[in-house]
Amino acid sequence: TTGGLGRQVEVGDVCASATLAYTDADATAFGYARGQTPGQPETFAGDAALLERLEQVGQEALRGATASSGSARLRVGQMLAGNSFVTAANVADTREVFPAALSTDMESTALAQVAAGAGVPFVSVRGVSDLCGPEAGQDFHIAVEEAAARSAAVVLALLS
């Protein structure tokens, strides 16, 4: 699952990665962009063919994923990952540095980096289980199982 970071993202949506970056990588003293690790690109791009296919089948799969997923939206854009949770204490900074970011988790960018190094097509697909922000600890409005079922339905449609 993932935490919603973009102001338009809602609990229950599913996010897919057009690009991925690290929230907590900071080698700016050496000329790198915030979110970029030394020797790596600034962001890792989602595979264009997978994203095109996802645009074709993802929203319909999401609507039919569970009894309550009819109004959920598939959102494609920048996703982030880091070593710590984005909370009320750091959400403003994260949004300032990454204004286009939809969501953040702890694994997706590392997986994208490994896939890029191996030449394997990659796109991250995550169900939004909660929102990052002042009430992040209180606004967990959807069960992890529900968020996972929604993203799984999108991935299965992508692979079919």
Regions found by a protein language model. Name each.
Residues 1, 19, 130:
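Flexible loop residues that form catalytic
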Residues 1-4, 107:
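A short, hydrophobic beta-strand-centered structural micro-motif
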Residues 4-99:
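Mid-sequence, gly/pro-rich, charge-dense loop/helix-turn segments that line enzyme active sites
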Residues 29, 50-60, 125-138, 160:
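A short, terminal or domain-edge coil/loop segment
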Residues 45, 49, 106-109, 142, ...:
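Conserved active-site and cofactor/substrate-binding residues in soluble primary-metabolism enzymes
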Residues 55, 109-112, 116, 152-156:
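Predominant activation on well-ordered alpha-helical scaffold segments within soluble catalytic domains
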Residues 133-160:
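His/Asp/Glu-rich mid-to-C-terminal helical/loop segments that flank catalytic regions of hydrolases
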